[in-house]
Amino acid sequence: MMQYFHWYIDPNLILWNDVKTKAQELADAGFTALWLPPAYKGMGGTYDVGYAVYDMYDLGEFDQHGTVRTKYGTREQYLAAINALHASGIQVYGDTVLNHRMGGEGTEIARATPFNEYDRLHPKGWTRDIKAYTHFKFPGRQGKYSNFEWHWWHFDAVDYDDFTKEPNTLYLFEGKTFDDYVALEKGNFAYLMGCDLDFQSQDVRDEVTRWGKWYLDTTGADGFRLDAIKHISSWFFPQWLDEMRYHAGKDLFVVGEYWLNNIDTLHWYINAVNGKMSVFDVPLHYNFYYASRSGGHYDMGSILNGTLMQQRPTHAVTFVENHDSQPLQSLEAPVEPWFKPLAYAIILLRREGYPCVFYADYYGTEYEDYGKDGNRYKIFLPSHRWIIDKLLYARKQYAYGDQYDYFDHYNTIGWTRLGDHAHPKAMAVIMSDSVPGYKWMEVGKPNAKFYDLTEHIKEPIYTNEWGWAEFRCNGGSVSVWVQE
């Protein structure tokens, strides 16, 4: 799949029109699904990436928060893009933010207990009245699609009191508790931002279910990318996903974002949701990140250690970069450009995991923003489309059959794919994070000629009578040897 956006997409692009025109081109390249950004109105209007959720029923149809369209276009353009993707044989996964709401029109006075933002286990004051923007009336929509309005009692907590305007403080509403079965950072990580939905409320669960069915009926989407799942009670999702799949009448693909570099916690979460969704392989991303910044001193033989790709491949969505890890973003941990061809070879040419290509890695981009140090930076991310297209071709033509691994060297690793009945030609992948490398590997094809699909090495390689050969790669590079 491709994540078809990054944080700094220009609103003038009209992303929905852009993807509509490129649907067949993407299919021809080898993409079978796109993860599209949040399609509903955010409190930031035209400039909202989609995660400051305001009205999930407004797909760019109503004049709310200063705009009819979203950052990516109008409802009609969104639906036309989905239709074009489906016509090209590409599935669509909708980015879905269920955790919070932001940008309410009306204030309400309610009793709440203050907590330090960084310690959700111990109150820092007495329960008192606060004034919060917790009434969501959606005046621009005027009850179309849903007449549900959000009030303070639908939320657990907020982070703003209009009476005191005290910073770094959360306010837990009286009679509420922070949701259980969530991440344990800060004592309890149920609260992330805005008005935090109370998933212990039946009214909230019913409304989220109604919206999910409406969204599927409206868009015909083939699955969900679920945002910020570590902030939502894990017990909520199995039943919700069952209802969504039953309503859609198809086996919707679902991947959740649980951002934590801890394989044991990801195993716990997958078990907690009864294996009903995949999750992003965050530990693999961090392995790529550290390898790319180690100057050739990373143990490449351990690149898959502690990852879902290695330990739970059927539930792993593998990725190199995303909109949160890209430079200047909240979870900034960018993989260095020189290493990205190696990382993409790992996720695209092995049999484990469901790989996700990042828009900015494919097309490249430039943008400016402020860093965490307060300084403004200009960022240039180069396009890796040429090499990714080569890898996608190799995946489609050669990544079949038995896989033999040669993760037996500190710098140079490789693996081979022997092909199957329908795809009889073999492939050998070799990479090094340091000096040029070579490796004796079996491809099961005696006396066969192999050439480097990446064109990094021009001379062909021939296997011996037992189907083995010494395959080579340049330093800090990857070569993909395919049978002629």
What are these regions (language model features)?
Residues S146-D203, D217:
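Long, low-complexity, polar/charged, intrinsically disordered or flexibly structured peripheral segments
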Residues H6-Y8, G60-D63, D324:
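Short, histidine-centered active-site or binding-site loop motifs used for metal coordination
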